[in-house]
Amino acid sequence: MSEQGGLTPTILEEGQTEPESAPENGILKSESLDEEEKLELQRRLAAQNQERRKSKSGAGKGKLTRSLAVCEESSARSGGESHQDQESIHLQLSSFPSLQEEDKSRKDDSEREKEKDKNREKLSERPKIRMLSKDCSQEYTDSTGIDLHGFLINTLKNNSRDRMILLKMEQEMIDFIADSNNHYKKFPQMSSYQRMLVHRVAAYFGLDHNVDQTGKSVIINKTSSTRIPEQRFCEHLKDEKSEESQKRFILKRDNSSIDKEDNQNRMHPFRDDRRSKSIEEREEEYQRVRERIFAHDSVCSQESLFLDNSRLQEDMHICNETYKKRQLFRAHRDSSGRTSGSRQSSSETELRWPDHQRAWSSTDSDSSNRNLKPTMTKTASFGGITVLTRGDSTSSTRSAGKLSKTGSESSSSAGSSGSLSRTHPQSTALTSSVAAGSPGCMAYSENGMGGQVPPSSTSYILLPLESATGIPPGSILLNPHTGQPFVNPDGTPAIYNPPGSQQTLRGTVGGQPQQPPQQQPSPQPQQQVQASQPQMAGPLVTQREELAAQFSQLSMSRQSSGDTPEPPSGTVYPASLLPQTAQPQSYVITSAGQQLSTGGFSDSGPPISQQVLQAPPSPQGFVQQPPPAQMSVYYYPSGQYPTSTSQQYRPLASVQYSAQRSQQIPQTTQQAGYQPVLSGQQGFQGMMGVQQSAHSQGVMSSQQGAPVHGVMVSYPTMSSYQVPMTQGSQAVPQQTYQPPIMLPSQAGQGSLPATGMPVYCNVTPPNPQNNLRLMGPHCPSSTVPVMSASCRTNCGNVSNAGWQVKF
C-alpha cells in the first residue's frame, strides 16, 4: 500500500508536466514569432522529451524522476523572452479550458477505479461472513433468501403429512442439540422434498447441514450459532387452532349478538302469527283474498263456463245424432239393399249444417260439392283394416245400386294386397278389402255422377296387384265405354278358368255400376254384381231392370240384403287415375248396345242376375265421338272359386244382340255380311276378344237376335301392364306384353264344340290412329274364331281364320 501511495503523487506530477508541454507545442504553432525563437523552442522541447524517455527507462518500475520545470530554464533567458512565453502560456490555458477539465476527469477516473478495487476486495470478504450469519437462525432466512419462519408455519398449517414430519424433525434436532457428546447427526435416506425440509429446519435451528456422498442423506453439525427456537412448532399449531376457534366463535357471536331483544321483538310477532294460524285459517284467508281479487271477473267466468258447457253438450248431441244416422243407414242398407236413403240422409245433414262445414258421414256423396281427398291404406301385412271412402253410388233417386261398406269382413284376410282409392272433384271411388286365399282381387268402378251435374270427362282407375306369382283364374273384362260385362242368360257373369289350372270358378264376381257422364240428365239406375266365395251361406239375388240407356259403365261392389247375407270375406277394389302398372289375370269383354241375357253356371254356385245400364246417346257420348281413345282394362280375378269339373275352361255366359239396339249404333266395320260382335267402332274400343255362334255368313247376317257366346278370356302370369282409356286429355303410360286369350264355346248351342282355342292378343301402346277396326274374314262354323289384337300391326299370321282387331 505504501508503494501505491508513493506512485500516485508521481503520476500526478507527471500529469501536471505533460499538460504544460502540450501548450508549448500549441504556442509554437499558433503564435506568430520570429523564426529563430521558433527554432529554439523546438530544440528545447525535443531535448526535454529525450530526457523524459531516458528517465523513464533508467528509473525502473515504480521509480519516477522529476523533470525540469519550464520556468527554470526560462529564468536564464532574457526578461523579454520569458515574459512573452508566460503570456503565451496563460493565453493558451485561458483559450483551452477543456484541457484542464480533461486532466481533472482523468484524475477522478483513476481514483474511482482504485476505490472500486478496494471496495471489491472488501465485499469479497464480507459475503463470507454474511453467509455464515444466514445459516444461523438468527435472521430466520435460508441461503436462498426464503423466510424460514413463514415457510414452516405454512407447512404446518396446510399439509398434515408434512406437519408430522416437521414435528418429528424438530424433536430429533432438539435431542441432538441437548446431547453434548454427539457433534453431528446423519438422517436416513429420504426423498428430495423431505431433504429440503431437513435443510430448512436445520437452518432454522442454526445447525450446519450438508449432504453425504450418496446425496440422499442429510448430515447436520453443531455450530456456534446453534440454538433452540423460543416457540415450538406445536405452539404455532395451537395458536392457529385457537385463532380458528375464536373466528368461528366470533362468527357465532356476531350472528347472535345483534340486539337480542330487538330481534326477539321483531321475530316473535311473525312466529306467533305463523304458529297460531292453522291450515283452515290459511285457506279462509286465501279465499277471502281471492274473492276480493276476482270479484269483478266472477260473473264473466260463470257466463263463459256456461257457454262452454252448452257447446260441449251441443257437440255431444251432434256426434250422437251422426252416430245414430250411421247406424240407421247401415240397418236400412242391410234391410233394403238400396242406397236411395244415402242421398236423403246426406241432404238432410247438409240442411242442418248451413253455416259451417258439416261433420263427416258415411252417407256423403259428390252431390255435397265437397272436394274429397284420396285416402290410402296399406293392408299388405294385415287384413283387419279396410278403407271406406265417401262416394255417391247413385245418379238418380230411383237406383238399384248400393254403397259398398267393408267393415270387418276382411278381418280374416291373410294375404292381401294394397288398396288405393282416389276421388275426383265430382266423383268418388268405392273401396273394399282384399279377400283371403288369393294374391289379389280387384273390382274397378267408374265414379258415377249425379244426373244434375254433367261432367266434362270420366277417368278410369287401375290398381296394381302386389303379388307377382299365383294369379287366380277367372276374370271379367269391362268395356271402358259401357262398363258392361258378358253374362250368362241367367245374369251371372261369364268366368273362365285358364288352361294351366284344372279348377273352374263357382263364385261370382260382384261389382257396383256407375254411369258415365251424360249431358242430358236422365234416370240411370245402376247394375249390381255380387262377389261370393266358397264360404257363402246363401244365394245372391239381385234385381234386373231394363233401362233405356245405350251406354253405361259398370263398377263392382258387394250387396247385402235381408235375405242375402254378405260374403264373409269379399274384396272390391276401386279404380284410380294413377299411372301404375297392374298384373291383370283374365278378362271378360263387354260391349255397348248389348242386352246381356242371363244364364246359369254349369256346376257352379247360385245364379246372379245382371242389370244392364244404358243411357241415350249424347253429343259427347262415346258412340258419336270418332277421336282415338285408349282401351281401359278392368278385371276381377276369382281364382279362389274351385269347382268339381275337370275342364280347363267353361262357357258360362252367352250374349244376345237385339236388332233394335244394334241398329241404333253406327256399324262401320261390317264386312261380307257378317254381324260384328262389336256393334260400333267408337263404342267398342275396349273389346279384347269375342266369340260367335254363327255357322256361316248368312247366319250372322240374318240372325241379329241370335245369342252370342260369352267371351271368356284368361291371362296367365305375365309382366304387369295397364291399358287405360283416354278421354279428353287423360292418358296413362302402358307396358306391352302378349298374353294368350281363350275364347271358349258353349256346348249345346249351334254346332260349336265344347272345346276352346287360345286367342293370342298383343296389347301394345296405341299409335295416334288407334280407332278400333274389325275385319271379319270367313270363319268356319266348326271352329272357334281366333282374334289377334295389335296396336301397331295387323296380326294376320294365325292358324285359324278369325276376327282381326286393329287399334
UniProtKB/Swiss-Prot annotation:
Modified residues (N-acetylserine): S2
Asymmetric dimethylarginine: residues carrying this PTM: R650
Record SMART domains: R3H
Domain R3H: 163-226
Span of domain SUZ: 227-298
Compositional bias annotation for Polar residues: 89-98, 359-380, 422-434, 552-563, 595-613
Compartments where located: Cytoplasm
InterPro entries: R3H_dom, R3H_dom_sf, R3H_domain_containing, SUZ
Residue numbers of Phosphoserine PTMs: S32, S55, S133, S298, S361, S381, S557
Comp. bias (Pro residues): 514-524
Top-level taxon: Eukaryota
Protein name as it appears in the record: cAMP-regulated phosphoprotein 21
